[in-house]
Amino acid sequence: MYWRHGRHWYVSAGKWVPLPADLSSALAEYANIVTPGRGMSSLIDRAMGEISGRVKPNTLAQYKIAAARLKTVLAEFSPDQVRPKHVAAIKQHFAKTPNMANRILSFLRVVFSYAVEWQEVESNPCIGIRRHVEKKRDRYISDAEFLAVREKAIPHLAAIMDIAYLTGQRIGDVLAIRRADVSEAGIAFCQQKTNKRLIVRMSADLGAAVARAKVLNDNVRGLTLFHTRGGKPYGYYTIRDQFDRACAAAGVENFHLHDLRAKALTDAKRQGLDPQKLGGHQTQAMTDRYIRQREIDMADPPKMGGVLDSVKNAN
């Protein structure tokens, strides 16, 4: 493969075949030319076709990111050329982002499980490769930080933040709220991750937040509570990027979109409510693990009075 005149080229028998200027796309196309239908890019696409209808939307979105990165890293490999040492190298390559590295490893393991089933490889090279240890997040967002970011958020993001906090649900579930899910009784959810069904009871605060959300783009009728000017639901990554910009504008660091759910469940417990029911967790242990990282014990200090009295008596 050669670079000339602003793009990549594949040369075979004296004939120059143009490839995309983008390196990752060029490598993927090069692999398909050299080993048509047998390269890693082809295997990943075929496996993705099998996976797409079997996983949750959030998982599928993560797999698509992993697929794009693996197509670049393994562009010149055929499936039978990938060895455990190559998988270990991929793990190390993405070590600075252990969460993403683990998603990539999980996806690659699934891809090769299909390759084994289709008898394209003898064994799965991902077996025996350990995942990175992911540090448990213990960041608690204070009320002041929440309000500071909300103040810098554009209107629909501010409304999403409010309803995410007041319902304690995952962002994907909040973005999926349909107008038909909202009633005087509350907001009905079917959690995408667990299929757990619950209704978050309507309160004065939640009702006000829903009312604010309904007036956004009210000239366009959409099926979902939150929608674009074209009537389509907002995508997760669109909202995440807008949220990150609001955090930067507010000067609040290390505030992730998912921290809204953690704050909601932690605050609910402190207010004497039922965080397990609000979070849709099957067991109390799941909720305790989720909240415990964000709770800090409050200890009372000793009083100086006794010390001062001792000093006075000694004098």
Regions found by a protein language model. Give the residues of each.
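Active-site/catalytic core of tyrosine-dependent DNA strand-transfer enzymes
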Residues: 203-252, 264
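C-terminal secondary-structure termini that scaffold catalytic or DNA-interacting sites
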Residues: 212-220, 228-231, 285, 302-315
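Basic, Lys/Arg- and aromatic-enriched nucleic-acid-binding interface segment
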Residues: 102-104, 117, 121-122, 127-171, ...
